[in-house]
């Protein structure tokens, strides 16, 4: 739970009572509106974990052709989900949806999360009391090498931990988590070879670390979110929770 501290002058009765009440009003955090959360949508939780069976609306025959059809369906679904939270043009939905669910999870964990102040032309996605967060989200059916940009984040943001005096956490979401684990080997898995682990340890020693978004989900104990998690099949259950 976030703790708020009033300025010393409040306790010393050096300001009028009505002003104290106004200060208290703005210092009390708003309760989390769980009903409006994207994490309440079962398909969002399934998408986050890589269970895309809800998109399979036709018989799969040809891998290349099927992937193109699924890409269209994934984009239509993503835009629809984002509009539930942010009505309007949701054509470029991937990054926005990732940031929304990341913010939701941290609020559910009782963390204070906000947009950080821009420093030296750096504008990370979020800041908590303990960390700076950079959110990387991808679709599952995007072709090409766009995801390889994630590999360069530690170098690009190498100065961020010193600038903000906080460790940098690179949160991988959706297709980004899948590729980082199964293709690039920067998340735990078979592709994380000893030499890659050496580089990752170097990043961590310099306060930069990659995190898998699904590691946060299992630790949530809100009924609405658990209902979505319980819809996952046995072979798509989430891994043990990751504790910040």
Give the positions of each predicted feature.
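Domain-level recognition of nuclease-like catalytic cores that cleave nucleotide substrates
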Residues: 169-244
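Hydrophobic, Leu/Ile/Phe/Ala-enriched alpha-helical segments that form helix-helix packing faces
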Residues: 102-110, 157-164, 203
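Acidic-basic catalytic patches of nuclease active cores, encompassing PD-(D/E)XK
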Residues: 2-115
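Residue-level marker for well-ordered alpha-helical positions
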Residues: 100, 104, 154, 193-197
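Conserved catalytic cores of phosphodiester-cleaving nucleases, focusing on short active-site segments
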Residues: 126-139
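Core catalytic machinery and nucleic-acid-binding channels of phosphodiester-processing enzymes
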Residues: 117, 125
């Amino acid at each position: 739970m976030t703790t708020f501290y009033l300025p010393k002058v409040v306790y010393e009765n050096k300001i009028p009572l009505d002003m104290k009440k106004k200060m208290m009003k703005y210092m009390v955090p708003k309760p989390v509106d769980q009903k409006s959360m994207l994490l309440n949508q079962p398909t969002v939780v399934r998408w986050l974990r890589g269970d895309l069976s809800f998109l399979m609306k036709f018989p799969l025959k040809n891998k290349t052709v099927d992937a193109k059809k699924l890409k269209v369906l994934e984009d239509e679904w993503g835009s629809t989900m984002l509009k539930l939270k942010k009505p309007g043009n949701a054509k470029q939905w991937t990054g926005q949806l990732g940031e929304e669910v990341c913010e939701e999870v941290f609020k559910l964990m009782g963390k204070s999360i906000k947009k950080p102040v821009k420093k030296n032309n750096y504008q990370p996605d979020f800041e908590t009391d303990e960390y700076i967060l950079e959110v990387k989200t991808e679709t599952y059916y995007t072709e090409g090498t766009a995801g390889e940009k994630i590999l360069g984040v530690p170098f690009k943001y190498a100065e961020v931990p010193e600038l903000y005096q906080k460790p940098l956490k690179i949160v991988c979401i959706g297709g980004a988590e899948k590729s980082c684990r199964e293709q690039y080997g920067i998340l735990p898995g078979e592709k994380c070879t000893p030499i890659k682990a050496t580089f990752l340890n170097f990043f961590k020693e310099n306060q930069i670390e990659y995190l898998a978004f699904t590691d946060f989900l299992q630790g949530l104990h809100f009924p609405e979110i658990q209902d979505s998690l319980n819809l996952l099949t046995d072979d798509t259950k989430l891994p043990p929770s990751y504790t910040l």
